[in-house]
Amino acid sequence: MEMILEEKDASDWIYRGEGGANLVLAYAGSSPLFVGKVIRIQKARRNDKAIKNANGVVSVLTSDEQHLWRENNELISSPNKEVLEQRYVKNVIIPLLGPKHVDAGVRVSVSKEFLECVDKKVTKQRPLWRVNAANVDTSHDSALILNDHSLFSQGISSGGDCISVEIKPKCGFLPTSRFIGKENMLKTSVSRFKMHQLLKLEYNEISEESEYDPLDLFSGSKESVLEAIKALYSTPQNNFRVFLNGSLILGGSGESTGRTSPEIGYAFEDALKGFIQSEDGHRTECFLQLVSDAVYGSGVLDRLLEIQKLDKLDIEGAIHSYYDLINQPCPICKEGKPLEAELSLHALPLDESLKIVKEYLIAATAKDCSIMISFQSRNAWDSEPSGDYVSLKPTNQTFDYKVHFIDLSLKPLKRMESYYKLDKKIISFYNRKQKAENTAEQIGNSKPSHS
């Protein structure tokens, strides 16, 4: 008999965090079926209805999206978001990232009452702006069960403490596309993340700029990777979280957090006691070294970067192919005099335009996903490591570790338009800031000095 999560089961699930489209809850009950699992529940989004295509196949994708993904029959016949997400990870992402670090999850049936109860239960723990934006979509009859990668071993604990780190790496390369406008050339020398920080600061979405630069994390240099991890620890925002045995000990749940204060730093140092065998005042430093060594040694970011680089044309190029795909006149070309390069995009066969847009959206998944690294200390009497491990020289400890990619959501086709608008907003604001700074510098330099 198929299992259905009912209203009475809602109390076993606790809020873990959320993104734009999903809530994530961790299991705190005793059923062996769910110990070591999280549940991913869709949030309510307008116009999320299944559509019949010309062949009468029901799909949650729009007709343009069905055309875009037409080579993948399983994907285009997805009747709801849970099925779509699972099939996208299984059929599109796993062939690119490999099965070792990706979990497609399994679907579980849920009752309306379960979803309503969960929605009510977690409201107080959610950031207010997230609550105002969307609630649980109670019209769904299934949710996605995934392994809880904040725990080292799923199922019953193997005894040792587990510390896990969640990193949202963001885009790790500078674009070189010939479609980038002359006025936007700063995009080729400053990371998108750094530019976006200025805009977020202007709109009070963050309290200060992050010290982190994704280019360091993806650099392939051991020293730069460590710098990136230290910067993430200092200014976590929503890019860095740490869990001890599944409980959050650093970072925010579902929202951006400010700088790591001395008080938070002391509490974190204390939480590492027993896990990192070092003197007081040195545990955090050793831990950040451990994370850095695992990121560098695993090589997972190299593969992720390859997928991010499927965005070959930048949004300034891909947007033209998008309008060809949806069969609409290109408003960007209408705005000004289109360049020869842009016209050449509109002259491409439709299959080429489809490929450009599809690869751009897959790259967008890779730019927005997170990686989860779980660590467990090895004892001297443990058998030889069978999986990945890292040695921490200052403490003479060895840790087994596992790396998983999470939040590998399919981006809606319609989002191409908002990607283009946001990109324009980010670069024009950054350009204005740079000009203002240069002008202020020139004025400062031209002032006569009084000796």
UniProtKB/Swiss-Prot annotation:
GO molecular function: ATP binding; inositol-1,3,4,5,6-pentakisphosphate 2-kinase activity; inositol-1,3,4,6-tetrakisphosphate 2-kinase activity; inositol-1,4,5,6-tetrakisphosphate 2-kinase activity; metal ion binding
Keyword terms, alphabetized: Acetylation, ATP-binding, Kinase, Metal-binding, Nucleotide-binding, Transferase, Zinc
InterPro entries with a match to the protein in the record: Ins_P5_2-kin, IP5_2-K_N_lobe
Cofactor dependence: Zn(2+)
Biotechnology: The gene coding for this protein might be inactivated to commercially produce plants with phytate-free grain. Indeed, while the role of phytate (InsP6) accumulation in seeds is unknown, it causes nutritional and environmental problems, partly due to the inability of monogastric animals to digest it.
Enzyme class: transferase
Residues that hold ATP according to the record: 19-22, 40, 147-149, 166-168, 241, 407
Annotated Zn(2+) binding sites: 320, 330, 333, 346
EC numbers for this chain: 2.7.1.158
Residues the record lists as N-acetylmethionine modifications: 1
Pfam families per the UniProt record, alphabetical: Ins_P5_2-kin
Keyword Transit peptide among UniProt keywords: no
A cellular component annotation (GO) from this entry: nucleus
Tissue: Strongly expressed in leaves and cauline leaves. Weakly expressed in siliques and flowers. In flower, it is expressed in the major organs of developing flower buds. Strongly expressed in sepals, petals, in the male and female organs of immature and mature flower buds. Strongly expressed in the gynoecium and carpels which are fused to form the gynoecium. Also expressed in the transmitting tissue and ovules.
Residues engaged in binding substrate: 45, 130, 170, 200, 238, 368, 411, 415, 419
Catalytic activities: 1D-myo-inositol 1,3,4,5,6-pentakisphosphate + ATP = 1D-myo-inositol hexakisphosphate + ADP + H(+)
Cited function: Phosphorylates Ins(1,3,4,5,6)P5 at position 2 to form Ins(1,2,3,4,5,6)P6 (InsP6 or phytate). Phytate is a regulator of intracellular signaling, a highly abundant animal antinutrient, and a phosphate store in plant seeds. Also phosphorylates Ins(1,3,4,6)P4 and Ins(1,4,5,6)P4 to produce Ins(1,2,3,4,6)P5 and Ins(1,2,4,5,6)P5.
Domains (record comment): The EXKPK motif is conserved in inositol-pentakisphosphate 2-kinases of both family 1 and 2.
UniProt cross-references to PANTHER family, sorted A to Z: INOSITOL POLYPHOSPHATE KINASE 1, INOSITOL-PENTAKISPHOSPHATE 2-KINASE
Family as reported in the entry's similarity comment: Belongs to the IPK1 type 2 family.
Record protein name field: Inositol-pentakisphosphate 2-kinase
